[in-house]
Amino acid sequence: MYAVIKTGGKQYKVAEGEFLKVEKLVGEVGDSVEFGEVLMIGGEKIVVGAPHVAGATVTAKIAVQGKDKKILVFKSKRRKGTRKLRGHRQHKTVLKIEKISA
């Protein structure tokens, strides 16, 4: 059984027991998170919401609160010798999907 959920402005296809890296969520490691914005549930029978599946929830547990890989942003002006190098690490949360209920 799988589901499509919406969190952090993005949509993710999830299944029970798998890990998912999403934008930072509020909570400590070990806390339980419930997603009510379930867009679709698949398995033997596919249920598509309009826009959400009524009564469906996905429960997950926070496994890791951390940062993503560093990306480098380099800006320069041609012929001027002006250069700027910045680094950025986005905050991420790793979830373990516990249960999909419809």
From Swiss-Prot:
Cysteine pairings via disulfide bonds: none
GO molecular function: rRNA binding; structural constituent of ribosome
InterPro entries referenced in this protein's UniProt entry, alphabetically: bL21-like, bL21-like_sf, Ribosomal_bL21, Ribosomal_bL21_CS
One Pfam family recorded for the sequence: Ribosomal_L21p
Alphabetical UniProt keywords: Ribonucleoprotein, Ribosomal protein, RNA-binding, rRNA-binding
Protein origin, superkingdom: Bacteria
Annotated GO CC locations: cytoplasm; ribonucleoprotein complex; ribosome
GO biological process, one term: translation
Role of this protein: This protein binds to 23S rRNA in the presence of protein L20.
Assembly notes: Part of the 50S ribosomal subunit. Contacts protein L20.
Family: Belongs to the bacterial ribosomal protein bL21 family.
Name of this chain's protein: Large ribosomal subunit protein bL21
Organism in which the protein naturally occurs: Pelobacter propionicus (strain DSM 2379 / NBRC 103807 / OttBd1)
Taxonomic lineage of the native organism: Bacteria, Pseudomonadati, Thermodesulfobacteriota, Desulfuromonadia, Desulfuromonadales
Gene: rplU
